[in-house]
Structure formats: C-alpha cells, structure tokens
C-alpha cells in the first residue's frame, strides 16, 4: 500500500498483485497417432496474451509441463520459449515438476532460468537463486520455498512441493502414512514464512474427492495417495496440478486443469485461474482458454447415420462407439473415416453368439487389463496393494 500526501487531502492507493495459476501442459502429448503440438503452442500463446493484457506479475505452473520423462527436442523448445515469453521483462514464473516430469532434468537449467525470472523446482529440497534487476524476482529462498517480490515492495510466499512419489519420499520414515510424510514435507517448506504476505502452496497432488479423467493414470484411485483438503489449512491459496478437470475445494484450493482436452470425458472448458491480492485478501477469477480442438464422444447403432453425425463435428477429434448386430464391413469403415478426418477412435460392439456384447480389450484401462489377466491366471481378483505396485512400476516405465 502506498500513501500519497497532498496539501489538501490524503489519498490511499492499494496496489494489486495478479498471479496466474496454470498446470498440466503435457507438452508433446499425442492423441492416438495425432500430433497436438500446434494446439499446445496456440494455448500457451493464449496464456502469454493473458499475462500481457491482464498485468500479471507472477505465473504459477503446477507440474506436468511435459508428457514424458524424456521429452523431444521440439517439446523442450516449445516449453522454454513459452516460459520465457510468460516471464517477459517484468514477470516471474515459478514452476514445479509433476509425475510426468523428470524433476532432475527439469531443474538442471535452474541457475540460467532464474536470470530470466523463471524458478524451477524439481524437488522439495531445491533452493532458488536470488536477486536480479528484474521488476519481479526472488527476494528470499530456502529448501522448498521462494519469496517473490516486485518493484513496489509487495511480496508473496510460495511453498513449492513437486510431485511427491514414493521414490522422492524414500528418505522419510516408512511407518508413516503418505499424508503424514507430505505434512512433514510441507512443514519443511514453511521454514521461511513469518507472516505479513500472501501465503501460497504450489503442488502436484491427488486430493480425496477429486474428479479424475481418463487421460490420467489411475494410480491414485485406490486411496493410498489421496490427501485430505484439511492438509492445506493455513494457506491463503493452494495452486494444484495433477487432475485435468478444473475443480476446487472451497474457493482457495483449486486445480486449474489441463492446457487442452486430453481425453474424451473432459467436457469442461479449459481455463487458467487469475488471483488478485492486495496483500491481505485474495480473490479468484477463472479465465477460459479457447485454443485447441474439441474432443467429442459419439454413439450410434447404424453406420450410415453415424457418418451423417460425424460430418457435424468437422474440426474436432471424435471417438465413435457403434453398437451393431453384425460386424462392421471394410466399406463402412472407409465411409466413416472419410466422413471426418478427426475420427481417432472407432469402437465397435457387436452381439456375440449368445447375445452378449463383445467388448474390445483396447477400451480397458491399465488397471482393468491387469485385473482381467490376473483373474484369468489365478481365478481370483488381485489384492489392492498388488494392483498399486503394478501401476507404480508401469508409471516408472512410462
């Protein structure tokens, strides 16, 4: 706050710091065999424009910037160009790794990135470089936290907790629950907080009760890694990544959602969250993102009617489920493909000899495939901890 004094009256001016929350870019992610990098570039350009037109001071990126541990050179180029433009000449970017990112690889360029106002946390033990002549920059840092200040003297405290998988928590006591381990990690990131500024947590977690989409691995769905919203008591705002559907727990614990629609059940519009703080209070504004193709899920019982329906969704990616009494012919398949070049998934369900539906196994999730295989070999369902172990191994190989 600034106090302007004149000869006749006092004028109190409140300065507002604007903070943009985004996550789950998944740069390099494809849909089936379709390249989506041009869509991702367009959506990132849209975020840059929001930063410029809405006077954003600080950008928070809550993990999963890449889709794999070893992103392509093209994906890395898109990432670095985007965050450099978001930082511009006067903004700062604070970014953490997610479960799809290699935290060590992501943070390798942290010293150079900090010179551009970009602060990369690959683990909860990282410490950011401080100082610089930029208008918005790090003024203090320690293990797992950074304080960002601007030229007006306003500051915001960010407790940064990248995706805490079991490998990253292996030094913690094994008898503790996952939630208790996280509580201690969060407490470590509070070491530099003494009040007097907005108090934020930036993390990549699965909150109990969250709505999951098909584009996310179901590794957290057994509940072992679901954390209660009460874990975040005491923070003014919690900027989360991991779940692709925008959602919130109260007003100040939010998932911004993914950059694009990455699965056919993600029908909610994509967005970023813009925070406005005067140093004592925070308000939230949801700003829609319009870049990227729609993902549409359709069903029909007749191939010709399905072709007519497909023509209505030109420019979208489509998953079509056909429920037929007889197998689909090759000519019908060609007709459907010609009706919409965005048809990326064609699921045909026909009646079996006994009138039962025949479901293609390619429609099953990793968890369902594992359970089906286990039942076929051992004649019983696998234990939940065995399923979790399998999915953890699958994640490590991804």
Language-model features, listed with the residues they occupy:
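Short, electropositive alpha-helical surface patch
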Residues: 74-87, 110-121, 213-226, 251-269
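Accessory, non-catalytic peripheral segments of nucleic-acid enzymes
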Residues: 58, 276-398
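Contiguous mid-protein beta-loop-alpha structural module that forms a pocket-lining wall or clamp
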Residues: 199-201, 229-278
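Binuclear metal-dependent phosphoesterase catalytic core
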Residues: 131-154, 253-317
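Short, conserved loop/helix-junction motifs that constitute active-site signature segments
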Residues: 88, 194-195, 230-234, 310-313, ...
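Divalent metal-coordination and catalytic microenvironments
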Residues: 24, 44, 59, 64, ...
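His/Asp/Glu-rich metal-coordinating catalytic cores
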Residues: 71, 94, 101-239, 243-247
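N-terminal active-site segment of His-dependent metallophosphoesterases
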Residues: 6-90, 201, 392-398
């Amino acid at each position: 706050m600034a106090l302007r004094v004149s000869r006749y009256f006092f004028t109190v001016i409140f300065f507002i710091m604007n903070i943009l929350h985004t996550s789950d870019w998944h740069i390099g992610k494809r849909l089936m065999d379709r390249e989506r990098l041009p869509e991702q570039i367009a959506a990132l350009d849209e975020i840059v424009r929001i930063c410029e037109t809405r006077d954003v001071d600080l950008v928070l990126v809550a993990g999963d910037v890449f889709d794999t541990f070893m992103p392509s050179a093209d994906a890395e180029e898109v990432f670095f160009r985007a965050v450099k433009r978001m930082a511009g000449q006067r903004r700062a970017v604070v970014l953490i790794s997610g479960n799809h990112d290699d935290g060590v690889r992501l943070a390798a360029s942290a010293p150079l990135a900090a010179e551009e106002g970009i602060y990369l946390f690959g683990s909860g033990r990282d410490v950011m470089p401080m100082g610089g002549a930029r208008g918005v920059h790090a003024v203090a840092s320690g293990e797992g936290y950074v304080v960002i200040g601007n030229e007006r003297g306003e500051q915001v405290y960010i407790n940064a907790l990248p995706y805490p998988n079991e490998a990253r928590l292996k030094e913690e006591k094994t008898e503790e629950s996952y939630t208790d381990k996280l509580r201690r990690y969060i407490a470590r990131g509070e070491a530099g907080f003494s009040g007097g500024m907005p108090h934020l947590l930036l993390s990549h977690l699965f909150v109990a009760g969250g709505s999951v989409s098909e584009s996310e691995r179901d590794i957290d769905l057994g509940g072992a890694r679901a954390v209660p919203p009460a874990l975040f008591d005491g923070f003014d705002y919690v900027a989360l990544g991991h779940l692709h559907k925008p959602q919130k727990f109260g007003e100040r614990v939010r998932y911004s959602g993914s950059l694009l629609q990455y699965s056919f059940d993600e029908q909610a519009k994509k967005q970023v969250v813009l925070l406005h703080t005067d140093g004592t209070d925070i308000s939230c504004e949801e700003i829609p993102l319009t870049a990227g193709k729609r993902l549409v899920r359709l069903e029909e019982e007749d191939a010709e009617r399905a072709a007519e329906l497909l023509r209505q969704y030109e420019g979208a990616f489509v998953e079509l489920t056909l429920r037929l009494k007889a197998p689909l012919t090759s000519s019908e398949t060609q007709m459907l493909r010609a009706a919409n070049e965005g048809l990326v998934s064609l699921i045909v369900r026909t009646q079996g000899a006994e009138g039962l539906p025949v479901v293609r196994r390619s429609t099953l999730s990793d968890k369902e495939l594992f359970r089906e295989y286990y039942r076929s070999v051992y004649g019983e369902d696998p234990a939940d901890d065995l399923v979790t172990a399998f999915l953890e191994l699958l994640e490590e190989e991804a």
